[in-house]
Amino acid sequence: MNYDNESTREMVSVSKSRVITYGLSKGADLQAQDIIYNFSRGNYELDGINFKLSYKGSIVPVNMKNVLSESSIYAALAATAVGIYFDLNLVDIAKSLNDFVLPRGRMNLLPGIKNTFVIDDTYNSSPEAALAAIDILSRVKIDDKSSKYAVLGEMLEIGHYTEEGHRLVGSKVFEGNIDYLIAVSEKSRDFVRGAVEAGMAADNVFYFDAPEEAASFLKDRIRTGDLLLVKGSQGAHMEKVVKELMAEPEKAEQLLVRQGKEWL
């Protein structure tokens, strides 16, 4: 059970089954400690998430090189708890987590052109999900000479919350010390307004009508070591940006969302 969730934690005392709790906070039976979000080691290789699995005095390092999201850690902890229940070795579990891969378009870490890195979160978007993704982007360690980009397509189907939600996300980009905001499609103009109103320099904010335009701009602008978060609702088609920026576009059909004929 997720120890970090108050409602779930309350279920522990009434459960008649064997319970293994997991989480990021102290008190969980199985805990992820010393979490580090990285994207490079040595020759600009993918590094992803590093943390330590702690269970009953045993501590084992874990590296999930393909992902960059807190939700991935919770998924790994839940899977580990199941493995522990079936008496699997903690070291073997940690090794298997090295190749953990999320579904396409959900905070997947991809190598980009010019030795850059792309966090592909293009499956869909909402204010809550965008805020969580930007929080991760702000926590990733990059080289001092490199830059972080939030490349955000509009968020659809959020009704009366549309303007406020976009402005809130825009302000989070500034508050998270993200170097540049790239806003794509009409409703994303409120990303721009929110960021600038929060204090972001206008010179660091760019707007484009279409993802193809944003991709063309970024291909010329990005430099070695830069890190880009690309996110947007399905209708924003931000996977088109990722396809232009990924180091191996020939793998787009395998790695990206909406690559079927009905989308292209």
Predicted regions and their residues:
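Extended acidic/charged loop-beta regions that coordinate divalent cations
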Residues: 3-61, 103-106, 110
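Hydrophobic alpha-helical transmembrane segments
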Residues: 72-77
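ATP-dependent carboxylate-amine ligase
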Residues: 16, 57-58, 69, 81-264
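A short glycine-threonine-serine/GTX helix/turn-capping micro-motif
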Residues: 62-70
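General small-molecule cofactor/ligand-binding pocket signal
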Residues: 20, 63, 206-208
